[in-house]
Regions:
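Conserved GNAT-fold acetyl-CoA-binding loop/helix
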Residues: 38-60, 72
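Generic macromolecular interface patches on structured domains
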Residues: 40, 49, 64-68, 159-160
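A short helix-loop-beta-strand connector motif used in the catalytic cores of GNAT acetyltransferases and
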Residues: 61-75
Length: 178
């Protein structure tokens, strides 16, 4: 628990990563990580064009920690050098289910960081929000994300045209029991 919020802090450590709570001093890294071409292509609603947008988003994310009212988004930090390389998240959906999400900055992709983050984050967050299954949804053309989901034990439940960030797109929807 933190003295300031009374909420239990997130701290997951793997061999290479630390998943923790956001702090306001992470805004610059969040802003920079959001601007890469893959983020713009696959999750355009998570691009922060200005440092102020990143600050406002972090402030909101911190405000929903410890609740089931909003996205539970946590930074992924490298243990070796303390770099903020992305995030992992659980997001409540309108139907009451939850979705996993993740983004690793382009300079750090291809190293298994997303898989490592998802594998360590899922059991902890599932316990916190009280669920026994979680969905993974991404664009079908996002081969790297499809690969991460499959590697993390998600089973396909739908591949085809569906709603993705307000547009009809070809999606890959999968589920994992926890």
């Amino acid at each position: 628990m933190t003295e300031q919020t009374g909420k239990r802090m997130m701290r997951i450590e793997t061999d290479r990563l630390i998943i923790t709570d956001f702090t306001m001093d992470m805004a610059q890294a969040v802003h920079e990580n959001s601007l890469d071409e893959d983020n713009r292509r696959f999750v355009p609603d998570e691009v922060f064009e200005t440092l102020e947008e990143a600050r406002e988003t972090i402030e909101f994310l911190i405000s929903v920690y410890g609740t089931n009212d909003g996205p539970q988004v946590h930074p992924v930090i490298t243990r070796q050098d303390g770099k903020n390389i992305g995030y992992v998240q659980m997001v409540p959906m309108e139907d009451g289910t939850w979705e996993i999400g993740y983004h690793i900055a382009k300079a750090y992709t291809g190293n298994g960081y997303a898989t490592e983050a998802v594998e360590s984050f899922l059991p902890e967050m599932a316990g916190r929000v009280g669920i026994s299954e979680v969905y993974g949804i991404c664009l079908k053309e996002n081969i790297a994300s499809v690969h991460v989901l499959k590697k993390c034990g998600f089973e396909p439940v739908f591949e085809g045209t569906g709603d993705y960030q307000g547009e009809k797109r070809k999606i890959f929807r999968s589920v994992r029991k926890i």
